[in-house]
Every structure is written in C-alpha cells, then in structure tokens.
Amino acid sequence: SIINMDGSHKQEDLEVISTGSLGLDLALGVGGLPRGRVVEIFGPESSGKTTLCLESIAQCQKNGGVCAFIDAEHAFDPIYARKLGVKVEELYLSQPDTGEQALEICDTLVRSGGVDMVVVDSVAALVPKAEIEGEMGDSHVGLQARLMSQALRKLTGHIKRTNTLVVFINQIRMKIGVVYGSPETTTGGNALKFYASVRLDIRRAGQIKKGDEILGNETKVKVIKNKVAPPFRQAEFDILYGEGISWEGELIDIGVKHDIIDKSGAWYSYNDTK
C-alpha cells in the first residue's frame, strides 16, 4: 500500500517495553525497548544478557503483556526467572532442536499477533539442521549467517505489522589477525547488525563485595546502535546474584547524578533525611 504523508497519518508515540533498569530506559531515549522492532543484546559470558531480558519480560508481564522465550541454549532456569519477577506459568517457553525450528517458531509467534515480546537466547546456539545431522569436524561455512539473513528478511515485515518486540541475545567472538581496531565481533553474520533498530553492548565493570563475599556485578551497558533516539549513551547499574537489577541502588545513583540526593562520604541524604 502507498500512503501520502500529508499529516493525516500522524506519527503515534512509540510504544516501548521497560528494560527494568531506569538508567538504561533513559539511555535508550524513548523509555525502553521499542515495540515493532528488532533488538540485539550482546556481550561476554556472564555479563547479564539473559538477566536483562528476563527483567524486561517481567516488566512486560506487569503491564498485561504476553511474552515468549525461545531457549536455543537449553539453559532456562525457571527458579531464577521467578526471582526476577517473571510469571513463569504465563511465559511461553520453547526449546527447539535446530536453528530453523527456532526461527520458524519465532515467525509463527510474531505472525499470530498475540505475543508482545519474543526473546531468542541465543543466536550462537541457532545451529543449522545440516550441521546437527552432519559429522563432527564437517565444515559448514556461512550456513548460520545465511539462515539468519533469510529469517530476518521474513520476520521484519511481520514484526512491524504486529508491533511485536523481538530481542536476540548474542555472544562475542574474536576475529583472527586484526591489528587495528577491535577484534570482537558477534555471531550469525552481518544481517542482524543491519536489521536491529537497537544494539546493546553489556559488560561487567566490577564486583560488588561484602567482605570476601561477592554479592553481584557492577554492569555497564552501551547503546551501540539506536534508530529511534541518539545512540552511544551509557547506563550503569548493579546486578545482584539471585535478585537481578538493584532498582533502589540505581535510583540513588541517578538522584546523586542530578543533585537531588546529596552524597557525603558513605552517607546519602535527601531533605535532611540520612
């Protein structure tokens, strides 16, 4: 269909789903992850990628949304998800055998129009059928990249039409022989880099300790790409083991940054209350 942008078709406010982190919602510029778009979250191992997605699912469910989790890594922990506020009994969970099956399920969920958010964990685990049925040591050059490229070509139109948020979790690999620039790259070829409206780079910045006991990680997220607001903004928050994102700690940090809360040494004060 062809439309004339003469003002009769007003640009509606972008619908978003909160990430569960106030700082990251602000860094994204629109208040969360945009619906009707593809989002990629990537980073090293144990950096908080799945935790961030589960926090976002919990926020979506709080607002009455329907969510699906495609667990290609076969590592979904319902006990941990429940601790983060996810209503596991209301979550659609799939653990597919092949990459083709995972992406077909994703396409079916999106086309149904009955799901608000779909998470695919992870792109690296989307193994093509030919590779699974082949022998160990067989070479399958570019198979996964072609699979992702074909799937995203099919998906994007349906995603926009049904206003579904699709989040792909991705892992980092090292390029061999890179002298200048970063040797890091993400798996699954270049298609996802192009189709994603938002790309988030999540990293551990340090540890949170109480004596010798490690309670969690200081986490830094950089918005590498953003088609809906200015990119390259950053957010920092704490992820506590078994609890998820520390909302209270983040709120205090933002309050200090904007001179709403006074910090003096280890003391915080607000309106003469310490």
UniProtKB/Swiss-Prot annotation:
One annotated GO biological process: DNA repair
Subcellular location: Cytoplasm
Keyword Cytoplasm attached: yes
CDD domains: RecA
The keyword DNA repair is annotated on this UniProt entry: yes
Keywords assigned by UniProt, alphabetized: ATP-binding, Cytoplasm, DNA damage, DNA recombination, DNA repair, DNA-binding, Nucleotide-binding, SOS response
Source superkingdom: Bacteria
Binding site for ATP: G43, P44, E45, S46, S47, G48, K49, T50
Pfam families registered for this protein in UniProt: RecA, RecA_C
Gene Ontology CC annotation, any one: cytosol
InterPro entries, alphabetized: AAA+_ATPase (IPR003593), DNA_recomb/repair_RecA (IPR013765), DNA_recomb/repair_RecA_CS (IPR020584), P-loop_NTPase (IPR027417), RecA-like_C (IPR049261), RecA-like_N (IPR049428), RecA_ATP-bd (IPR020588), RecA_C_sf (IPR023400)
MF-aspect GO terms: ATP binding; ATP hydrolysis activity; ATP-dependent DNA damage sensor activity; single-stranded DNA binding
Similarity comment: family membership: Belongs to the RecA family.
PANTHER family referenced in this protein's UniProt entry, alphabetically: MITOCHONDRIAL DNA REPAIR PROTEIN RECA HOMOLOG-RELATED (PTHR45900:SF1), RECA (PTHR45900)
Function, as annotated: Can catalyze the hydrolysis of ATP in the presence of single-stranded DNA, the ATP-dependent uptake of single-stranded DNA by duplex DNA, and the ATP-dependent hybridization of homologous single-stranded DNAs. It interacts with LexA causing its activation and leading to its autocatalytic cleavage.
UniProt name for this protein: Protein RecA
